[in-house]
Amino acid sequence: MTTVIRTGGLTKHYGRVRALDGLDLTVDEGQVHGFLGPNGAGKSTTIRILLGLARKTGGAASVFGQDPWNDAVALHRRIAYVPGDVSVWPNLSGGEAIDLMARLRGASRHDKAYTAERERLAEAFQFEPRKKGRAYSKGNRQKVALIAAFAVPADLYILDEPTSGLDPLMEVMFRHEIARVRAAGATVLLSSHILSEVEQLCDRVSIIRAGRVVESGTLAELRHLTRTEVSFEGTDAAAAAGIPGAHDIVADDGRVRLTVDSDAVAGMLPELAARNVTGLRVAPPSLEELFLRHYGDDLVALEGNGDGRGR
């Protein structure tokens, strides 16, 4: 499988601040790869380096086998980029801004295929292209960048919090467009802190913390790293006593709940069957639980800061 993005030991320092501290990331061709972490973890810095907008301090970074700093012009012809906070020209209409962005990637407003795609996307995203940029809300500015990105085919889509400011219906349209470009063979790097979005869209996920990738793999692979929740009808936690591999046994809301290492679930089922439990549910860990495995301590610290609201 061809690797589209590769970084190894990537570092970026701003003075004494280490924004990236040995980041290793691999994104293969045709994947939708989730890049997950809170603000300040290093996601946007990584993306700026991959786009040739920032120069790395150390380590290696390549896109399509080329250096993103030295070969930025050639690479930008193959890349569509959507930031999380879009600025538009105040005196250009939305349609003019879209056409200008598309021209930078080789499209022309006289190209019938491009104009048809632009109009389809404007309708799908419920976007009014005749208004001036200064009249657009944050969500509509986001639509300008999304339409410009999706209207011209790209080999790689780098999307940094792309649904910021969109309402739920427009988020659905965004997911449809990701499915479309994926089916066409494009590669997508999706940076987000919206766990449900990443879980629905991505083939693989990399979790970043303090400038390093701390977990990377498919959701199935990552789920093996944490426990699965098992529950059944009952009011007494003693009903689960003695089950091999059971952890965190509690009874609440008429159900007995416990957790078990994900690779031990199959071995536990005969034990549960022997106890004639009813209403059995087995829930694999969600992406949120995987995420909290690495960031739970930070959230506890924030909740304990001052009045509990965090800063």
Label each residue range with its predicted role.
Residues 38-42:
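Walker A (P-loop) phosphate-binding loop of ABC-type ATPase nucleotide-binding domains
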Residues 115-137:
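Conserved ABC nucleotide-binding domain
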